């Protein structure tokens, strides 16, 4: 990925987080979880560190289905149950609308 593409991703991620904020005041029952959006980027960890880390708190490389995914644990979400899941899904959905390949990483606590 070029620096310009990475900067665009950082911008798109902020927009996706703003989109997910609509779920901030919803119920938060259900199982406590670590659900987080994930995105496939053609970038190295060094590129992510330089360009996108200010927009993110944590990045995790995780092989899934033979592909490299960055799990966005630091994406802005609230809650620890259903609300967290809804916000993670909303971020993933919005990034997909921006033409990124996305999924949601689901993990119960």
List the model feature ranges, each with a label.
Residues 1-65:
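N-terminal leader/targeting segments
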Residues 71-109:
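Short, compact, well-ordered microdomains
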Residues 40, 45, 69, 105-108:
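Charged, low-complexity intrinsically disordered segments
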């Amino acid at each position: 990925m070029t620096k310009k593409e990475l900067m665009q991703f950082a911008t798109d991620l902020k927009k996706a987080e703003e989109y997910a904020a609509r779920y901030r005041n919803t119920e938060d029952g259900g199982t406590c979880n670590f659900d987080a959006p994930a995105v496939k980027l053609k970038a190295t960890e060094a590129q992510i560190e330089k360009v996108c880390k200010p927009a993110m708190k944590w990045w995790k490389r995780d092989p899934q289905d033979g592909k490299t995914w960055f799990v966005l644990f630091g994406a802005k979400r609230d809650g620890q149950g259903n609300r967290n899941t809804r916000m993670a899904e909303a971020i993933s959905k919005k990034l997909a609308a921006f033409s990124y390949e996305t999924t949601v990483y689901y993990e119960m606590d």
